[in-house]
Amino acid sequence: MSQSEPHIVDVLIAERAPRLTGSWVWPIVRPILYAVLGYPKAVAMAGAIEPLSGVDALAYMSNLLRLQVKTEGFENLPTSGRCVIVCNHPTGIADGVAMYDAIRRVRDDAIFFANADALRVAPRLAETIIPVEWVHAKRTREKTRNTLSAAKQAFADERCVMLFPAGRLARVEQGVLVDEPWESSAVSLARKHNSPIVPVYMTGPSSRLFHLFDRFSRELRDVTLFHELLNKQGKRFSLTFGKPVLPEKLSIDADQASLQLKTYIERQLAAQPNVPFSP
């Protein structure tokens, strides 16, 4: 990156807050907001992982955060062969690091569906993630084709495929943390590739600044992504793995099947870990 080009962290912030960063007030509030968001730490992290391989980038993030990850029902995760892990999304990017920390205890072949912007920070993350354009307006046939092609290869290689079907951090509704509506892609892929689905319920530290800003501004909320990753250092995460669900046990309708899984994970698996999925 040349001296004249903006840093990727600035670019991602500008894309998430175009009205704010394009307004006359931005030069005034930027120093304050950047201090609150821990901007220097985000720049340092991005610089550290930019040249790394996909495996090394994930390992770097794991070592940087040093999360305390507790698992329950971990025996329900197949130690080999294709499978699809679906999980709620309570805190943000750190959820993926917590899942990585858990899975790597028994498998070294996991691949994660993740926001395609990750490749703009560290290009070789393409070795360990399947990039997805989560902004519907930015999706193209080529991007979708590339995502599906990468997924097809992962299943052909009998890998463990991990998705957060909500695609974004959960929101607080009436005092309760609830995922956004789930995309149906996890169910569709599992069905197409005859893969068992492993449901996981995750809890972690509250992303307070995200939820505070969410009350006032979507743009302010969305620029907290790096802050809500780096402030999870040393925090506790709990992952409850449910028994694998065969795709044929789900509703034929992919959207309905996704809702069934979401409801099971948020309401039943969270409270009764030993109770298997039942449509």
Indicate where each model-derived feature is located.
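Non-catalytic C-terminal accessory region of glycerolipid acyltransferases
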Residues: I8-I13, T144-P279
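Membrane-interfacial amphipathic helices and adjacent loop/beta segments
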Residues: M45-F74, D109-N146
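Catalytic core of membrane glycerolipid acyltransferases/transacylases, capturing the structured
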Residues: I28, V36-P40, V84-T140
